[in-house]
Amino acid sequence: DVDKDSWQISLDNVTEKISKEAVGIIGVHLYGFAFDVENISNFMKKNNMWMIEDSAQSHGAKINGRNTGTFGDIATYSFFPGKNLGAFGDAGAITTDDDDLATLCRKLADGGRLSKYEHEILGWNSRLDTIHAAVLDAKLTLLEEWNIERRKIAKIYDDTLSNIEQVTLPVKLKNTDPVYHIYPILVENRENFINYLKDEGVSTGIHYPIPLHLQKAFSYLGHKEGDFPNSEKICFNEVSLPIFPYMEEDDVYYVCEKIKQYFKKT
């Protein structure tokens, strides 16, 4: 399960739940917030286990001044258009400081080959095309500026919504610098809340409505509702508020005002 306050994987989660058969873990920097990757990475190394960082939502997020995606054996990034750094379509990348892993990843992404017509293993066609690469190269120069704007918007939400008793915000871990791919809150009676904001011209999202252990794809594991209470609470109550680099400050305050009005009425 995730931590009930940060909504991320924690060292306590890992040390309490990991089995003797485990060989590694995948940790997700969810919503653009960094999980406790430094301590978890140290624990995994001491126990000779690998760690993959899912950095799909954390382009530029930091912990103790160090970028997420640089602690594990491998990090994965998504460049889907909706991400903080997005291409024109589906795209992604893998980073690692292990030469052997890098070679293997290059093979797998190019049909199992390192040179033309010589296939050493079975692979896929996951090559990033030139147009996507050019778009990402241009956008990369703007990423930090965009992340700064996201943080400004998030601060307005933090300062305003933290005073509303019916709204729960995730706790940012100490010495971390999120990039707020999503600004998530928890509220009860989510559908009523979402519909009210929609009527007031405010679009929202849900990330994510079904926890992994209740997905049909993982039913073979035998989990049931109640097994991961923190994850379930987040999935059943989370609402994502509007946040993007070019969002006007007046619009952010408008969203906050409508949220305050909603809870005054209810």
Give the location of each predicted region:
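PLP-dependent aminotransferase class I/II
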Residues: 1, 11-12, 16, 24-28, ...
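Active-site phosphate-binding strand-loop segment of PLP-dependent enzymes
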Residues: 5-87, 93-95, 240
